[in-house]
Amino acid sequence: MESSSTPLAEYFWIAGVESVSYQDPNSQPAPAVPVESTIIEDGEPEDEWTNGGQPKTNARHSRQNSASRLSKMSLTERFSIQTLDDTDGNTKSNRSSATIRAVNPPDFSNGNDDSNGNSQNPAPSGTLGEGSMFMGDFDFDKALVKFAAEREVFLEDLTFSAGAKVQARAPMVNPRMERIRAEESDSGRLSPLRSIKGSIRRKMSFRDMNSVRKQPSNRISTSRAASIRTTRRLSNYNSVIPPPEPLNTDPDMHPLKRRFEPVLLDRYPPQEAGDEISRRGRFPDYVPMFAFPNDIQIVSSDDRPRSTWHGFTMTSDDNSKLYGITIIIWIALNADVAEDVEKKCEEWRQSHMSEEERELAASLGVRLAGERTHLSQLLAKLPTIPSGSPARERLEDEISTVEEKITLMTDMLRPLRHGAASKIEGLTAGESGLWAPRAYGILGRDAGNMSFWKEWLKAIVTPMTDGSVLRIPPSSPRVGRWQPLERYVVNLCTEAFNPLGSKTQVELGVRELRLYARKEADNEIPGSRTIDIYALFRCLSLENIVALFEYAMAESRIIFLSSHASMLHLACHALANLLYPLKWASIFIPILPARLLSALEAPCPYIVGIERRYDNIELPEDDYVLVDLDKDTIDATSQPVRLPRQARRKLMSLLQVAAPHKLRYGVATGPPPYAMESFPYDAFSTENGSLFRTSTPKSTLGKWVSQSSSGFGEADPPNEIQPPIFNAFASAHVENGKSDRPSTSKSGKTSPQSSVSPVSINFPPMPSTPVSRSDSGFALASTLREKRSGHFGEEKMRRSSSFGVDKHPPFQKPGMPFLNGHQANLSISAISVESQNSVIGGANGGYGGGYAPSTYAQSTLAASTIMPSMQIQPVRNTETTVWVEGHCFNYMPKDNTSMCTICNDLAEGDGVYRCTGCKIVSHGRCLGYCSLICPEAFHADRVRAAFVRCLASLLYTYRKYLGRPSKQQKSNGQLYAFDMDGFIKSLPHDQHDYAAMMRETQCFNEFIHDREMQPANDASIRLFDEIIMAKKARGRSGLATGLSRLSTLRASHGASTYGGFGPARGGSNSKIPAFLGDISDHIWRTASVPLPKGNFPGEYKTIVTRTPARLDRSLMREPRSIQGMPRVEPRGTRGLIRKQVPNMFGTTPPT
């Protein structure tokens, strides 16, 4: 077991709003204070504008001419987003922009007049704001219909986001921007025989950009060391990030639209732990701003807003990165604060709303309460009427009508909520109906631990939800008892250590849960076990994925846009991970705060994510790529530099086999549920199932980079398919050998169907099922929402492909069992429309050949010739088959003994549904809560292999041109010198232009620089070289394994040519290179961190369910180990003396 002195996490922190207070609009602004010298970047000259700058015209940055923008973004006028602390490593202020002090107060008189909802005019004509609406003959139902049809413009003068519903806004239009079409066109230089037709290829505008972007050097090999340092200096945050813009404090703004600056409430280790601070690194100032990228708003909501999560990345001045994960929960404002907010709202109502508008809001509240009462009465009648009877159907229709009316009235009331009381009896949860967010987060230096941190944070905030997360067994001495938050924090940040390699996995416990932190082995792609790529592939089509990859290879300015911050985090990290072996070396900001939007004008490559709800989003004038993750679109100012034709077609072909979730399994496009909120459908489900399992999935990289294209669709053996985890606590019982599960209440609660965020999230609709509405009490609360959303009585058509025949074993022709050593399959042209039944018919298992059927010998069939002629067949829901998130559920009417994987309840006598791929079982009522992809519908390991195979084909001969360095190069520490010109000339004719483009990119220069400076046997260098060797081996013919005496002898001595996977089903004779197939270091021996336990003062439930703004040091215990090194307790006079540990508790700040 390795020893480590690196903690598993550097810091735990809490951020939120310090106090809800509204300054007097008549008060004078604070006098201007010059910017202190501490925020001036080290080594940079004095900034001139700090002594005489012009104030901004509004809260957000306004459009300026190019000269002023470039002047503002110049190198000598940058602020660093890295820590701006004092010499002791800590700032005295806990605010997110503590070191930014405006010289002149901003002038808000001209900005945001229309968006603040401060119009003195009544509602627009045609809306419900007219005075005639309050007459006695007013038809309320017609008003509801009108609102449903015109809700986007309804009362737009009064609508406010307040962290809630995202209103439709004018599209961000740039006259130079165009929609990138998924069309394959010739790229690169054409051969002389094909140059007659030719093509006009648009060049990337950034090459001709008049900016300070890096300039290519013709003598890369002789000046690379210096140029790399220069480029890194240009590409760090100091070069592109301006100071945060001040908050908009317009006195006419509605109190619930007012944004508050997030502050750091507490952290561990605390500021007083000097030795620990120096060892872990200084704590950045801007963490609260990245935790709340759109700042903080008080939300008025009947229900507690949904918990969300996201990650962010911060870069310091030395180009080292800090990674953060935060989970946000919502705290109800206490009565005193809520009363103060209500007073401010009343003052605003008196000065900004007409009497008719206030009367409308009050009337809506009364009508809504009445409809809720009516719904309760109808639900009480539901169990008394037999299922299937006409009366039952009429009652269900009436219930659906009332629910629809309630939904519309709630949406109508939302913009007018400030015209009625904040709390509506019988509707509002909590004591006030006003909520403020609070963030709990982790900072660390290892990006591979981000998924682990996320699941750990979800576990520790579960008791804070006080029952909102369903199907959590009650705590007990046998099952486990919750501990105070402070003890979990010490356990993670002090007692746990970070695993160094694949020999050790670190086990952490939260009650009965066991989480395992792991690292990839040296012969695995970095991040392949820890970085999720499925979310990106669910949002974008394969054509857009490849186009995005091409933009990243060309180092474009890439801007991701989404309504969900967590989706931005997942997409940015997935894209960077797919570039392996190249590394994104430029600006990387997965979540760009709204007050730093002017960084989009940075004249250098970047990958940046912005939320759709930001106000006044202004894109650069040219040279950028806008990727809308919610709408599956890519808009750019120019076409991408396309991959070479053959490489692009083969990549697309492999991706269609590795990621068939949309083509063959009917998965909807859009962010997955786990990218929308922390607990989808109020369940502790996890997309990172391996984190909760002791056993580690086998490495498959060697298999898929050695496999021929024709065998790339081979199905996984059933014993290697890990089913998704829909309840981590239930899986913990299975891991511990416990099968009993205490029953729970509230089992019918589901995520609200309203699309208002973050109060609720609108998930993909539940599929139609033949299940009766009288299944159980679970259905009472859920099926009604399903019917209202159109989930019943409507067949959902999804697209699929005739690829589904891989559910059947391949048919063999009699008398011809082998063709040249390969199995013979039916031709694609022989697949009829009825063949779709084979997709859903394999209920009994079998994992036949997974590639496209063909009569050709598989070794002679190129992947690029298969997919263009592929026939697409629709995926249909039938009476016995339901498709949900890639799962093909078949109805098993006689199965009354299986346990539902989703709700962990036994079958109730009416049968269950079983997935033909991963074998999970579900009640009919639970199908809509299946939020995780089926492992058979998406193969992340093959997707990564497809991209790395593409890059291996582009860089196939690079090692041949690493020669001896010159004396000057040797003095710079180079071991090799790369002949760039020789490498480009050696490539095929159609790859010359693409290689010339790569020559100008920083990521390729870094790739060559690393190989010039490091020996070839270094593990990080050798891995990609071995992948290239596997590509070479794929092109060599060999005997079948079964006919080779040598292979038999090797297998008998544990040296199987297939690395333990057995011969490929597609007939491939590829041999896995020894390095890629070596599993001697794939041990992952468990090193357990002491479990937090013990008694603590105070009432148990009060302590474990609190949502503290500051950590209580009295509830902490001295760490039992320091990053894995145990502290021995003294035992009498002969006992060993306890190792001295610096006090990291500090004192509890005054509340």
Curated annotation (Swiss-Prot):
cDENN domain segment(s): 524-656
UniProt note: phenotype after gene disruption: Enhances virulence of the pathogen towards Nicotiana benthamiana.
Domain dDENN: 658-1019
Residue stretches making up the uDENN domain: 242-500
Predominant cellular place of this UniProt entry's protein: secreted
Biased composition (Acidic residues): 39-49
Zinc fingers (Phorbol-ester/DAG-type) by residue: 886-934
Any single Gene Ontology cellular-component annotation: cytoplasmic vesicle
Top-level taxon: Eukaryota
Protein location: Secreted; Host cell
Compositionally biased spans, kind Low complexity: 104-122
Keywords assigned: Metal-binding, Secreted, Virulence, Zinc, Zinc-finger
An example Gene Ontology biological process: regulation of Rab protein signal transduction
GO molecular function: metal ion binding
Compositionally biased intervals (Polar residues): 64-99, 695-711, 744-760
Disordered: annotated segments: 22-130, 178-197, 236-255, 695-809
Gene3D superfamilies noted in UniProt: 3.40.50.11500
Family of the protein in this entry: Belongs to the EPD1 elicitor family.
UniProt xrefs under PANTHER family: DENN DOMAIN-CONTAINING PROTEIN 3 (PTHR12296:SF21), DENN DOMAIN-CONTAINING PROTEIN 4 (PTHR12296)
Role this protein plays: Acts as an elicitor that triggers cell death and defense responses in the host plants.
Protein's UniProt name: Elicitor of plant defense protein 1
